[in-house]
Amino acid sequence: MTIDLSLKSNQQKTIAVLGASYAGHRAIQVLVASLPEDWRVVVLERNTHANHLYAFPRMSVVRGHEQKVFIPYTNMFKPALDRRDQHVLLHANVLELDQEQRRVSYELIDDKQSGVQWLHWDFLVYALGSHLPDPINVWSNSEHVNTHDGSKMMGVKWLRDAQDRIEKAESIVIVGGGALGVQLATDIAVTYGSSKKVTLTHSRPQLLPRFDPWMHEKTAARLQELGVELALGSRVDLSTVSEDKKRFKLLDGRELQGDLTLFCLGQTPNTSLLGASSLNDSGMAKVEPTLQLSANERIFVIGDAADAFGAINAGHTAWDQAEVAAKNILALIDNKGQAMKLEEYKPTPPAIKVSLGIDRAIRQTMAGELVEVDSGSIDLNSTNMWTRRGLSTDDLWQ
């Protein structure tokens, strides 16, 4: 593969990174640690802080730890050392991706008066992930959704609103038996005990269906121990969902109702900017083993947005993909765009840790080990995400 990287000698070259969550953040750190002096990274991210999504289910139930899951981007460019200032983080909404002209349009969230602006790029890392289910999506299902600015304080308020809704409801129906639904159901049941009726429904007979049946067996046993009612093996009949979403039927005729319904259904890839021709039938970006977009070798797609050869959507797979993509970009830059063999991404076996209440968890490792473990602290060790990024935890409100 040969890519023309020729530009005027006085023109700085740019790698645009769309999204700075798990995948984007790792790609940024690998890039800035090794880029030549005439290259910069420009990051477009709508949140002012990294959202530690894996702890969101817990924080939407348990009070007092919300501030820990919004982590400053302060050290994002730290590996660049003395050249840190040449890289840029823009708090912005991405509007349009022009692949032919190699430019992306955006609007600054804190300065909408400046209008739509364009950024030209030489390589682009697409790490916009997926549209999240409402129970963990701070950009939806919120009273202040129209004024949400992606700030930490808005995110904290969103989680507290979620806590209030759960506390007020006497009966709760959770739709979806993946990790999110399971974690919410067990956390609510442990926190509130028999004072709340909790029902978990899932379209398949097996909970956590992408994993070993042992994971389902342990999960189902724990849910029954906690008094959570299970309604498995039938989908929600969407035509029967009431306007307030408090009542609906399953396709097998069973009727469910609650004061609060939490729809924890699957994520959908956030890939509309890439264009329909670049997507598979599930809306995921079609990529080469090098993680280059099949339709454009200058664009690398990583994380939940990529159809990455069977890889599950998870932080550890996003990390691995980010490393492959960033290393390939660096190799192309170092080789002046000339034809070369690039690194290929190979997905690892499915692995996950799922909490089953405040103090219990189960884990399936990449080696296929199935173990019951301590779930860790009540905040799911969220402050570790701070220290791993070289941040002090003395002030968790920064």
UniProtKB/Swiss-Prot annotation:
**Keywords assigned:** Virulence
Q: Which InterPro entries match?
A: FAD/NAD-bd_sf, FAD/NAD-binding_dom
Which superkingdom does the taxonomy of this entry point to?
Eukaryota
The disulfide bonds in this chain are none
Instruction: Give any GO molecular function from the UniProt entry.
Output: electron-transferring-flavoprotein dehydrogenase activity
| GO CC terms of this entry | cytoplasm
Q: Induction: what does the entry report?
A: Expression regulated by iron through the urbs1 transcription factor.
What is the recorded function of this protein according to its Swiss-Prot or TrEMBL entry? Protein of unknown function; part of the gene cluster that mediates the biosynthesis of siderophore ferrichrome A which is contributing to organismal virulence.
Per its record, how is this protein called by name?
Answer: Fe-regulated protein 8
Task: Provide the gene name from the record.
Answer: fer8
